[in-house]
Design a protein with these regions (language model features):
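Short helix-initiation/N-cap motifs at beta->coil->alpha
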Residues: 33-42, 118-125
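A late-sequence structural motif
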Residues: 17, 154-193
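Alpha-helix/helix-capping structural signal
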Residues: 13, 140-141
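Short beta-strand and adjacent tight-turn residues that come in two discontinuous sequence segments
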Residues: 35, 49-55, 120, 137-139
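Short beta-strand-centered segments that line the small-molecule binding cleft or hinge
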Residues: 18-22, 38-73, 86, 150-154
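Short alpha-helix C-terminal cap/hinge motif
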Residues: 1-34, 42
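Short, well-ordered beta-strand segments
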Residues: 4-10, 52, 76, 101, ...
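C-terminal regulatory
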Residues: 25, 65-72, 76-133, 142-159, ...
Length: 193
């Protein structure tokens, strides 16, 4: 029996189109495994995953890394928040007086003194802002995943997008691995690298 290819995917990543393409053209089965952003490299490093679709930045030491796509960042707030009146886009200047209920991954902080919030998941952060307390900035895909009727999201146009990438250990560079890389890059059985 051929061993399955085990691929982790970080919260919000969308591996479905690649999984469909893989299953249509390969004998090896594909096992998709959800991983959190905090633990996104653990399975690749310990060998329980062959590859992972991750959100950069990550420690790339000992890993191959192929960029897949970028995601815009969005501010999420209660429907009752002033942000709800804004157009589809805001800038960080529009957010300088806000309380971030979760630190932003880029390190950007509003100029307003920030309260000490306990660590919380993306879902917990959205529940907190839905209650009318503060704002959270997340990748669009994560905000969509946890969408609620009582929150709004606005693109933060001057924050760099986050990047989704495929990573795998440098010593694992076999045909199956390269075939999956090819699938993520749009290659078909009739094309080559």
């Amino acid at each position: 029996m051929i061993a399955p290819l085990r691929v982790g995917f970080v919260t919000g990543a969308t591996p479905d189109k690649w999984a469909r393409s893989w299953r249509a053209g390969r004998r090896e089965s594909l096992h998709l495994v959800p991983v959190t952003e905090a633990d996104q490299l653990d399975g690749v490093r310990d060998g329980s995953l062959d590859m992972a679709i991750v959100r950069l930045p990550v420690d790339r030491d000992g890993l191959h890394c192929v960029r897949l796509y970028d995601e815009v960042q969005v501010a999420v707030a209660s429907r009752e928040h002033l942000l709800a009146a804004a157009d589809e886009e805001v800038t960080t200047a529009d957010l300088v007086d806000e309380q971030l209920v979760r630190p932003h991954s880029s390190g950007w902080r509003p100029t307003a003194e920030q309260l000490e919030w306990p660590p919380m998941s993306e879902q917990d952060a959205i529940e907190t802002v839905a209650a009318g307390t503060g704002v959270v900035i997340l990748p669009m895909s994560v905000a969509r995943l946890h969408q609620r009727k009582d929150v709004v999201r606005r693109v933060v146009s001057d924050l760099d997008p986050t990047t989704i990438a495929l990573v795998w250990r440098t010593e694992r560079d076999d045909d199956v691995t390269q075939a999956f890389v090819g699938v993520t890059k749009g290659r078909t059985p009739n094309t080559s690298r």
